[in-house]
């Protein structure tokens, strides 16, 4: 049987991907994904991650953000990561594979966190995109709501939250909720974020317990 022909959109995506300077840089530097440049840019601007901190990384696979965070927190810090997809081990990262939307997975993740509060929660989660905004946007907003709920459970006073959000239905309401829970809230569009993508990162600091 012959392979199905690629669609025009998938061919365009592949060309964009392999021509992408951040993809090329990630490969040259032995990084797990181009996404590391997003968190690196946020870190350079906002200086959120420090030595000895405890970080939770949601939507971690293939591990670019976790790889970056381990270097930032050092030997006395902790990085706890979760993703529905498998992830090759990273020294210093406690990884849980599972669907964050499931209660059992959330309970297991909270068990990994333990009694100590978390300094930063990072979420780069995104649903499998169907290409239909009326389907994709609610799925995306559900994930970011779950990430915010986790903040309410485990984030330390004055802690930080970085979350990828797609602009669209529910975005303004979500932003308002985040602003009610944190002292300072900024919206970042990293240079490495593809210009035609609706994604932005909400960077929130000063969690109010």
UniProtKB/Swiss-Prot annotation:
Residue sites binding S-adenosyl-L-methionine per the record: 63, 65, 83, 99, 124
Residues annotated as the enzyme's active site: 164 (proton acceptor)
InterPro entries cross-referenced by the UniProt entry: RNA_methyltr_RlmE, RNA_MeTrfase_FtsJ_dom, rRNA-MeTfrase_E, rRNA_MeTrfase_gammaproteobac, SAM-dependent_MTases_sf
Annotated GO MF terms: rRNA (uridine-2'-O-)-methyltransferase activity
Origin: domain of life: Bacteria
Presence of the UniProt keyword Methyltransferase in the record: yes
Subcellular location: Cytoplasm
UniProtKB keywords: Cytoplasm, Methyltransferase, rRNA processing, S-adenosyl-L-methionine, Transferase
E.C. code: 2.1.1.166
Catalytic activity: uridine(2552) in 23S rRNA + S-adenosyl-L-methionine = 2'-O-methyluridine(2552) in 23S rRNA + S-adenosyl-L-homocysteine + H(+)
EC category: transferase
Pfam short name (any one): FtsJ
A GO-annotated cellular component: cytoplasm
UniProt function note: Specifically methylates the uridine in position 2552 of 23S rRNA at the 2'-O position of the ribose in the fully assembled 50S ribosomal subunit.
Family matches, as PANTHER family: RIBOSOMAL RNA METHYLTRANSFERASE (PTHR10920), RRNA METHYLTRANSFERASE 2, MITOCHONDRIAL (PTHR10920:SF18)
Family from the record: Belongs to the class I-like SAM-binding methyltransferase superfamily. RNA methyltransferase RlmE family.
NCBIfam families: PRK11188.1, rrmJ
Protein's recorded name: Ribosomal RNA large subunit methyltransferase E
Organism listed in the record: Tolumonas auensis (strain DSM 9187 / NBRC 110442 / TA 4)
Gene: rlmE
């Amino acid at each position: 049987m012959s392979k199905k022909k690629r669609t025009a959109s998938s061919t365009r995506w592949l060309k964009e991907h392999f021509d992408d300077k951040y993809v090329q840089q990630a490969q040259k530097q032995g990084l797990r994904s181009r996404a590391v440049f997003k968190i690196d840019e946020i870190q350079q601007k906002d200086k959120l991650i420090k030595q000895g901190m405890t970080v939770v990384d949601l939507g971690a696979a293939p591990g670019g953000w976790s790889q970056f965070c381990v270097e930032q927190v050092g030997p006395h810090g902790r990085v706890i990561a979760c993703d529905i997809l498998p992830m090759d081990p990273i020294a210093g990262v406690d990884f849980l594979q599972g669907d964050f939307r499931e209660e059992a997975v959330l309970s297991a993740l909270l068990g990994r966190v333990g009694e100590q509060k978390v300094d930063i929660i990072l979420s780069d989660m995104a649903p499998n995109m169907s290409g239909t905004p009326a389907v994709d946007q609610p799925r995306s907003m559900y994930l970011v709501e779950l990430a915010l709920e986790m903040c309410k459970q485990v984030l330390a006073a004055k802690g930080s939250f970085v979350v990828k959000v797609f602009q669209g239905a529910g975005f303004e309401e979500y932003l308002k909720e985040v602003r009610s829970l944190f002292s300072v809230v900024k919206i970042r569009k990293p240079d490495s974020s593809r210009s035609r993508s609706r994604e932005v990162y909400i960077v929130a600091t000063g969690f109010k317990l």
